[in-house]
């Protein structure tokens, strides 16, 4: 399988299609009430650094970075279609997002995922992300786990 990556912005229709599927996936995993709470933190209309993964011109995954502080970006909206998981698509996306963050002069990436997202937790820790205290809007949210990675 040949995977190609495209840098884009939040106006990209393929990205918005994948985010719709991600939201559906999370609503099923977390339940509607918890998903509705998290939705307020996931407005994608201002994202300028998005990567969409394709297989044979079909969008199969996405991820974004947004500034967190002067040295750090936050990884947002990481998602790979169910049928494409286990094929290194997420690794390619995360590699590309971290490389883009480096190009922009950042030193660290942070991210949040839910406690029920076992595959995501396993993926991020195997990639080198380490647990940190929950930050910002996730500070007192029991379902959230936050991670950080040094990319320099």
Language-model regions, residue ranges each:
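Conserved catalytic-core motifs of GNAT/GCN5-like acyltransferases
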Residues: 10, 34, 110-115, 121, ...
